[in-house]
């Protein structure tokens, strides 16, 4: 399956995954910041940062990708329908 076809056909899955990653980043940041007296846990900090960056990349990517597909694609002729028709004569 074409990965770009997945984004083109189901962009809502990517948006939901990006929102879930943002929620995970917020939860990890809250847990890290609630430990005021203890030293910061580097694992929670790295999970929070990585989740936030991936979520922002996914959400911005799907916004830019959908905008590109809407405004920048030209008319593409599907030539496969002509090649497979039974009435085509080869001369």
From Swiss-Prot:
GO terms for cellular component: membrane; viral envelope; virion membrane. Envelope protein which is a major component of the mature virion (MV) membrane. Essential for membrane biogenesis. Is required, together with A17, to form bona fide crescents, which can progress to form the immature virion (IV) membrane. A14 and A17 form a lattice that is stabilized by disulfide bonds and serves as an anchor within the viral membrane to which several other proteins important in virion structure and morphogenesis attach. This is Virion membrane protein A14 homolog. It comes from Fowlpox virus (strain NVSL) (FPV). Belongs to the chordopoxvirinae A14 family. It is found in: Virion membrane. The chain crosses the membrane at residues 13-33, 47-67. Residues 1-12, 68-91 are intravirion.
